[in-house]
Amino acid sequence: MVYRRTHQVVKRLAARRAAILAAAREAAAEAGMAGVQIAPVAVRANVAAGTVYRYFPSKADLVSELIAAVSRDELAAIRRAADAAPGPSSALAAAITTVAVHTLSQRKLAWGVLAEPVDVDVSASRLASRREIAGEIAARIDAAVRAGHLPAQDTALAATALLGALHEALVGPLAPHGFDNNRAKLRDAVQTVTLFALRAVGLVDARARGLVVQQTVLPAETLIGA
């Protein structure tokens, strides 16, 4: 007789997998990807190390899926914010602001997803993550161009440039410090990079400033893990 998993079994397996990923995410938020090790993650998830390997056959698999999961969450947040905006320019501003807030809210996790050196190959997952988010930003730039709010441009290249600038400024090696538990500095940083990005794609300065002021509302959870 062929064994068929019941609905409850499937739910239990999915919940266990989610718990392992959540534990890995907590570890990365605290210590970067260096903190994502099988045994400590198993302890956090309250499972045996062998159980982690059952779901993720190697550390590379675990870290790659963590990167993918974090990126999916960010992409969903970007789309929600942009879709709620009243027009294409404000949608672009909302998307950029969301990227900045997500990056600053958990800087160690963000750096781990983006570029922190790790002892396993996760380049494919990182590339897919960047490509998806850049594609979403490009779509928002393109919508603003088609509406006549921005000049014609290579939207894919512009989106890639904007993301590179934001990430380098907020979590790269030259990024300033002192954001922890300082909402004023967090807000200033988000406003600065968002204004820079909007100007860079050709939005008139007065309009760009107005959009930045409208968008920069930091949620309480922004400070978690900063």
Segments from the language model and where they lie:
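Helix-turn-helix
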Residues: A19, A27-D61, E65
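Hydrophobic alpha-helical connector segments
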Residues: E65, A76-K108, A159-L162, R187-V190, ...
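Short linear capping/connector segments at secondary-structure termini
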Residues: G112-V120, V213-Q214
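Amphipathic alpha-helical packing segments from all-alpha helical-bundle domains
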Residues: A69-L75, D121-A147, A156-G172, D188, ...
